[in-house]
């Protein structure tokens, strides 16, 4: 079975072909990072224009690299939520058009769900597991009991961790995106700046929730004092942020007696986060799964693979009236597509 995956939820135009027997046949991504650098973040209208310009060339290249004719594709998977609506509609429109012209099933995929199952492309992972989702727009914990069996545990109350990285990098004059540059700079610094770990010991209603706005504000105050080097501030911020991510995840694993954890999203590429979870494998007797670096950021491969799993395991497809959603939690998404499925 061959599935085409289309991803345009933010600022990356990505298309991939996944074959159930041969694996990934292609994975083409057109990045817009350079375009958005001057804005210090993603500018929605610019992202939409670039998607419109890039989507057909990226699609053609993905099919060419896979040595596949569109007529031989068995299904069209596309990210439908969450994301920038002006970006989502580009990919959804192309997916609907291909589905209609070539009479192929239209398979809806949730962006966060795709990030989580990206690790399944290269690893065999047993259920149940805890999923820690860390990206520019999301910081969430889920209990995953099976495919489409998702329980939301908690999320950020303000900034996502990737957003905090971007803002701290901007404060330090390091440019965009902030995650990679802070990760690199922190290797040259020392953890000498005393910074808070928000909600790290909370056992009440915010036990599995996150908050990074206070940490961000504390960093700003230290920068304004002018006492510490940029390298030390970057290192101390990274230590604080990753401490919280690790502690909350381990707490969830203990609460539900889970031994496996999947770390997903763009921030899963962070070297210190990987180091800390590696240490936790020995200290807590857990197994941590990270996607390979090329599958950490947005890509079509994760969409194609997740679309394959949906088509194979639940057969859920939608008709052309299905629309993208800017905000939609992963567990709620499953409820919606089941009600909307044309094959249920």
Swiss-Prot record:
It is found in: Cytoplasm. Substrate binds at residues 133-137, 166, 179, 183, 270. Binds 1 Fe(2+) ion per subunit. One of its GO terms (molecular function) is N(6)-L-threonylcarbamoyladenine synthase activity. Coiled coil: none annotated. PANTHER family: TRNA N6-ADENOSINE THREONYLCARBAMOYLTRANSFERASE, TRNA N6-ADENOSINE THREONYLCARBAMOYLTRANSFERASE, MITOCHONDRIAL. HAMAP family: TsaD. This is tRNA N6-adenosine threonylcarbamoyltransferase. It comes from Persephonella marina (strain DSM 14350 / EX-H1). The gene is tsaD.
């Amino acid at each position: 079975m061959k599935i085409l995956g289309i991803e345009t939820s933010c600022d990356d135009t990505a298309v991939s072909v996944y074959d159930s027997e041969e694996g990934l046949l292609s994975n083409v991504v057109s990045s817009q990072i350079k375009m958005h650098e001057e804005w210090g973040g993603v500018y929605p209208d610019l992202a939409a224009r670039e998607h419109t310009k890039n989507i057909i060339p990226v699609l053609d290249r993905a099919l060419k690299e896979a040595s596949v004719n569109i007529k031989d594709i068995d299904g069209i998977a596309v990210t439908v939520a969450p994301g920038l609506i002006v970006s989502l509609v580009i990919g959804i429109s192309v997916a609907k058009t291909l589905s209609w012209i070539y009479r192929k099933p239209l398979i809806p995929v949730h962006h966060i769900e795709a990030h989580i199952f990206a690790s399944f492309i290269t690893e065999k992972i047993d259920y149940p597991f805890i999923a820690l989702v860390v990206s520019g727009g999301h910081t969430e914990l889920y209990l995953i009991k099976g495919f489409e069996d998702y329980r939301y545990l908690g999320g950020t109350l303000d900034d996502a961790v990737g957003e905090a990285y971007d803002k701290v990098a901007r404060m330090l004059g390091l440019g965009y995106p902030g995650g990679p540059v802070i990760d690199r700079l922190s290797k040259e610094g020392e953890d000498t700046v005393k910074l808070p770990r928000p909600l790290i010991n909370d056992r009440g209603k915010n036990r599995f929730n996150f908050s990074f706005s206070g940490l961000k504000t504390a960093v700003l105050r230290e920068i304004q004092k002018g006492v510490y080097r940029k390298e030390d501030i970057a290192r101390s911020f990274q230590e604080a942020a990753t401490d919280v991510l690790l502690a909350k995840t381990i707490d969830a694993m203990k609460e539900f007696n889970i031994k496996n954890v999947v770390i997903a999203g763009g921030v899963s590429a962070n070297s210190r986060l990987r180091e800390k979870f590696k240490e936790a494998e020995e200290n807590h007797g857990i197994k941590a799964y990270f996607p390979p670096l090329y599958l950490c950021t947005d890509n079509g491969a994760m969409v194609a693979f997740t679309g394959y799993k949906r088509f194979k395991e639940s057969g859920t497809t939608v008709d052309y009236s299905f629309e993208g959603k800017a905000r939609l939690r992963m567990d709620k998404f499953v409820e919606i597509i089941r009600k909307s499925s044309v094959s249920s």
